[in-house]
Amino acid sequence: MTQLSTKILWLFVAALGAICFGYLALQNGESVSAIYLVVAAVCIYMIGYRFYGSFVAYKVLELDKNRATPALVENDGRDFVPTNKAVLFGHHFAAIAGAGPLVGPILAAQMGYLPSMLWILVGGVLAGAVHDFVVLFISTRRKGRSLGEMIKDEMGKFTGGVAMVAIFGIMLIIIAILAMVVVKALAESPWGLFTIAMTIPIAIFMGIYMRFIRPGRVGEASIIGFVLLILAIHYGSVIAADPYWAKIFTLEAPTLAIVMMAYGFIASVLPVWFLLAPRDYLSTFLKIGVIVVMAVAIVLVAPDLQMPKANTQYFDGTGPVFAGGVFPFLFITIACGAISGFHALISSGTTPKMLENETHTLAVGYGSMLAESAVAIMALICACILHPGLYFAINSSSALIGTDVVNVAQTISSWGFSITPEEITTLTTNIGEYTILSRTGGAPTFAIGVALILHELFGGVDLMAFWYHFAILFEALFILTAVDAGTRACRFMVQDILGNVYKPLGDIHNYPAGLLATALSVAGWGYFLYQGAIDPKGGIYTLWPLFGVSNQMLAGMALLLATTILVKMGKARYTWVTLVPAVFVLVATLYGGIQKIMPYEEGNKIANAVSHVAAVSIQSQKIKDLEFKLNNTKDEKEISTIRKEISIATQNKVGNLLNAILCVFFMIATLLVIISCIGICLGKIKIPLKETKYIKIDEFQKI
């Protein structure tokens, strides 16, 4: 293709994207086809990768194809393993793409499709992809060091020490939440559990095939793995229909929680080429395959976005799906769909230890985040093609809308979104569920959206239930890969912390130390997971409200580290690349964090609904009132009921108090990183650059 034709092609892509984007932004009063959103997103991602990604890669970071990576230099056959770019892309994408891009945009859809679309597309290209890419680059230049260790090396021991503890706490919360989503999806689901279980032997076979049987034959292993995966999905439905096998593969949540912990431990201590990388690569076939099929199906089916462009009545924070104003809570809620601190832990955990060549960081780091942003766009579409009344029936709490279909329809219709009981019951029947009311959390909405689109092309209404349950399975597989990779990254983090106490424990080549660190990691997130599995109001459910804020604080810290390193590298003129998104993310997140620790304010329902401190005050007063009632009644039945209510209120009080304390600690850690970044950039704090020695690819074996 000539230079002129290339320019014409990119001008066409830019013009097409601008037209579709503009049409979505300017349309008023009428429903808009989802095709415009798909086309706008594809065009923006193409332009972002080709031009902005390349600018960051070769102007800002100056990637060097001749520089040896930690995988080549250390190559220990366990954690440091040079990995094919396509396989590593699959591993990295599978590891970072957890619950966030599926759930966040669906919840944020209560504000309308436009605010979420803007942040997912603009934030994904200019913030999230840059964040992942730059952190992967700087970790690769530092022997694959973890985020906390790099903050300690580059920004000072005290700041780094506090940050490491905060990051570890955030990591445990994130992994436990991801694991709980998987447990909820697979509990009582023999089809899902069988299919997920079968990906393990398939992945092991692929790992052995690519390393020993046919080294380097990634294409062959990919075809075999894909065929076996399709067979596993098919026979999962056969297993579910068989009374004997269905019973074997039907596990309750507490049992599944234990299985998850065991799997997380094993996957984290085995050589990365044996299970983790091939399983993540295999999962990526299904992940990207479903997203591509969804995009094509949307173009063919052309469903309308029925959600209004902007539900301005909820911008003040009075929405029924989640509390909090459009700023900052839209950005905090969307989270991983645009930018995620969890990605920094993978970009400084497993992935930098597997890079064959430094130039692969562009495709693996920047490209994977764009793929995740595309997942978020698909999730947003799944929410917005629903009738708004159905969307709010699914995502509003039963305390708000009730449990009777007629009352629910009347309540939601009074909000301005007309819906009939028949519409609710028809959809419920079509997807094979007993109810769709108050199926909060985002996952059921995504599955319903997938079913509504795919049944138009494959099978009609008769197969809508199949596509719904397939989507639930897809979500479980989608999220599980983030759990095993996250646990491995958490192990590196624990070893960094232990290494400050006893140096040999910090050696990641020390296998016994690795086993200890993995056990501590799994025990940490596993405790919260198991408690949540046996008590729907305890364990990780207590910490769930911290996920969004803590995750975004982590992203802000990572971007400030990147800014600091760019200044030390003599690239201060390019610091806007990381500093601008860092400032926006931190302003939004710290503002949200402050709202979460504000005291109770009489009459301010929105602020009180957001604040953990206010919740403590509310629950304390409730406990006092209940104790007064308890002391003034002699009815045994009423006494029993009141005591249960006191127990629940006490649990809520303790949970909110813990959240408030952790929120303050995470903000303190973030402020320390901000202060250190400012001090270093202004030359007030002198800490030398800690980049590892340059080794050429053709020389490293001689050293």
From Swiss-Prot:
Entry's transmembrane regions: 6-26, 29-49, 87-107, 118-138, 162-182, 190-210, 221-241, 256-276, 282-302, 319-339, 374-394, 463-483, 514-534, 547-567, 574-594, 660-680
Subcellular location per the Swiss-Prot or TrEMBL entry: Cell inner membrane
Membrane topology reported for the UniProt record: Multi-pass membrane protein
Keyword field contains Membrane: yes
Record keywords: Cell inner membrane, Cell membrane, Membrane, Peptide transport, Protein transport, Transmembrane, Transmembrane helix, Transport
Disulfide bridge partners, by residue number: none
Pfam family, one: CstA
Record note on disruption phenotype: Deletion mutant has a reduced ability to utilize a number of di- and tri-peptides as nitrogen sources, displays reduced motility and reduced agglutination compared to wild type.
Main localization of the protein described in the UniProt heading: membrane
Single GO biological process annotation from the record: peptide transport
One CC-aspect GO term: plasma membrane
UniProt KW Transmembrane helix keyword: yes
Classification via InterPro entries: CstA, CstA_N
Family: Belongs to the peptide transporter carbon starvation (CstA) (TC 2.A.114) family.
Function in brief: Involved in the uptake of dipeptides and tripeptides. May influence host-pathogen interactions. Involved in motility and agglutination, and has a role in stimulation of dendritic cells.
Identification of the protein by name: Peptide transporter CstA
Organism of derivation: Campylobacter jejuni subsp. jejuni serotype O:2 (strain ATCC 700819 / NCTC 11168)
